[in-house]
């Protein structure tokens, strides 16, 4: 187990350093000091490749300062994947130093106080288990985070938090919700390309939830038709009215008058079957990465379905981000913002081939995308490549 202590309590991980590490095999604990004033300091980094498994508290932040290795897993995400408790209360001293806005708080907080906090994490370390989930989430989201969003004032950095009810990450930092930037107030206009003559490219999945559900229930939606239009034609309604009907069926339960439509009948059957399994087994697992969702009296069958659907969306996207991170075209272009059913890229002027490769990866297995391009994030125009 590795417990990294960053120098700053408030700065983004890219703008701080590792103050110290506490490392434990469950029996022996080792404090490695780089910047804390309480002890002798060293310079050497720890070599983690010799360990079989390395569970890190806050792996996404840790990877700003250490290279990823295949033996690394996030402790909290490992417990979350198993539906086990991963909550550790922060000690009061950290709250005190936050209020003081001390820029190097963790260099000043006594070592024994850090060790007290570490002990609370150590108590739950024994429940950790290897999973792709606890490795790919912090690795993939951290990779996008590091790329930053470029503005005329420099870079802004997002902060993804996947420890939510559905594993769909929130993304708020310094008061800005990057997962829900408004389209009509000009706030997006500050985000531009970092490259000379570069542009921003955004790929949006068409009717993402509809197509994800279709995969779950074995219904084929034509790739050359928009998913919402495909359903609208079955209602005999215009698109705007049809969308409202669709959302009502998917998130509130299928109404009798739409039960004759195969897509909704099979969706309803899937929801009911999953709910019975949930009641019988007191848990279900997500379709791709097998994360457990335990019984909760506050859940009903439609809420459970929404949790599973959002988890499916996120898990597929995490696998996509992992594949994108392995593209090797000697490109400079990078993904800079992930927002559930779309990914925004900063693309160098000579790298259209990169976007073509990205599009191919994102569309695999029948998930068509739409492409928008712009000089800034507020002025994006649909295009074809």
What do the PLM-derived regions correspond to, one by one?
Residues 63-147, 182-301:
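Helical catalytic core of nucleic-acid polymerases
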Residues 150-152, 256-259, 287, 335, ...:
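Extended hydrophobic-aromatic, low-complexity segments
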Residues 52, 70, 198, 333-334, ...:
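A structural micro-motif
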Residues 1-90:
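Conserved RNase H-like, two-metal-ion catalytic cores of nucleic-acid enzymes
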Residues 11-37, 137-139, 146-148, 152-237, ...:
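Acidic, glycine-rich two-metal-ion catalytic cores of nucleic acid-processing enzymes
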Residues 46-61, 204, 256, 334-337, ...:
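Short glycine-rich phosphate-binding loop at a beta-alpha junction
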Residues 369-385:
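Short proline/glycine- and acidic-rich turn/helix-capping motifs at secondary-structure junctions
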Residues 133-137, 248-249, 264, 336-343, ...:
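A glycine-rich phosphate-binding loop feature that marks nucleotide/adenosyl-phosphate handling sites
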């Amino acid at each position: 187990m590795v417990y990294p202590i960053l120098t700053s309590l408030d700065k983004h991980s890219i703008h701080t350093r590792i103050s110290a590490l506490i490392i434990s095999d469950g029996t022996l604990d080792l404090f490695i000091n780089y910047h804390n004033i309480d002890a002798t300091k060293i310079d050497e980094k720890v070599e983690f490749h010799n360990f079989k498994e390395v569970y890190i508290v806050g792996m996404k932040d840790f990877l700003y300062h250490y290279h990823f290795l295949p033996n690394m897993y996030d402790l909290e995400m490992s417990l979350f994947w198993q539906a086990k408790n991963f909550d550790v209360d922060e000690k009061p001293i950290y709250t005190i130093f936050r209020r003081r806005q001390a820029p190097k708080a963790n260099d000043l907080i006594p070592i024994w106080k850090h060790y007290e906090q570490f002990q609370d994490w150590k108590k739950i370390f024994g429940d950790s288990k290897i999973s792709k989930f606890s490795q790919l989430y912090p690795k993939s989201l951290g990779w996008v985070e590091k790329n930053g969003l470029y503005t005329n004032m420099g870079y802004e950095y997002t902060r993804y938090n996947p420890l939510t009810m559905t594993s769909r990450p929130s993304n708020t930092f310094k008061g800005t919700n990057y997962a829900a930037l408004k389209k009509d107030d000009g706030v997006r206009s500050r985000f531009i390309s970092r490259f000379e003559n570069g542009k921003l490219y955004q790929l949006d999945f068409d009717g993402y939830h509809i197509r994800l559900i279709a995969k779950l229930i074995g219904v084929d939606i034509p790739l050359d038709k928009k998913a919402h239009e495909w359903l609208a034609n079955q209602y005999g309604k215009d698109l705007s009215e049809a969308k409202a009907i669709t959302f009502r069926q998917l998130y509130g339960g299928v109404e009798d008058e739409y039960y004759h439509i195969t897509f909704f009948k099979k969706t309803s059957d899937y929801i009911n079957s999953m709910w019975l399994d949930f009641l019988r087994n007191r848990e279900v697992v997500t379709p791709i990465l097998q994360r457990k969702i335990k019984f909760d009296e506050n859940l009903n069958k439609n809420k459970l379905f929404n949790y599973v659907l959002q988890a499916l969306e996120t898990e597929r996207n995490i696998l996509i981000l992992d594949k994108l991170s392995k593209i090797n075209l000697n490109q400079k272009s990078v993904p800079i913002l992930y927002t559930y059913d779309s990914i925004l890229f900063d693309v160098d002027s000579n790298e259209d081939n990169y976007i073509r490769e990205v599009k191919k990866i994102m569309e695999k297995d029948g998930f068509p995308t739409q492409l928008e391009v712009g000089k800034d994030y507020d002025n994006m125009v649909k295009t074809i490549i």
